[in-house]
């Protein structure tokens, strides 16, 4: 897409600096996965600091930036000076709307060659190792790669440009969306959906407008995913499941989540968008983690615990309750309330 064409899709954008006109804008980037000749969105200081920490890399990759106009107007002058090193800058009074509007043409571009209707084996475009086992009634999309010893059971759908590693077992009726990468020695149980659209919308003029996702999912080696769990694709960069992680049945993992190595997510737990779970975190049954939360390595959430949006918990935390707090503190609070209620009851 040409730079000036951005205005066709998002007319509220205003260019404030154009040091260099890129030949073409190739994609929208996430700040933790910058792509060459792409654009990023900056809505607040948290995102700004991420970009400024990698400003030299952003300049070399010819990254352009669209910022929230009010945030830019209030920005410190020294930050503006740093941003002016980039090829181009723009602002908009409705950043979420601009992101939504621009996500669609880049989604259309990425999906233009994704044929979800024809089995890639008929087209001769798949790369399936002779040592893989493919059951009946399996759909394998174009450009799918399946490694030696992998077993794909009946009823599974693997959409184009996805990869299945060696010795991975995919049980019946699993759905794997495009641009999903699953490592070796994994076990994916029946009913799992990997790579479905993230739950992202912008409300404008009475409608919920869809944010079109292109990030895909990466599942590393030796991961087990229980039946009827769902892992959403990232918005512009992958949702990531770390090596050796174990996911129980009926678990929801939202877009842009990054789960470390050796984590355990028990049944009906839920992880909201852009959460980071470091290595060996444990979520008890029905535990829930709010968006943009960061939970340190080795932390444990008791069953039913609810961690609020944007919380940061250090390594080794043990949490319980809603809103989540230190487990011992929560238990003491529950005991105190029980004692108070018993005393009141005894007065009746």
Residues covered by each model-derived region:
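Terminal amphipathic alpha-helical/low-complexity segments used for targeting or macromolecular assembly
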Residues: 1-124, 180, 185, 191-192, ...
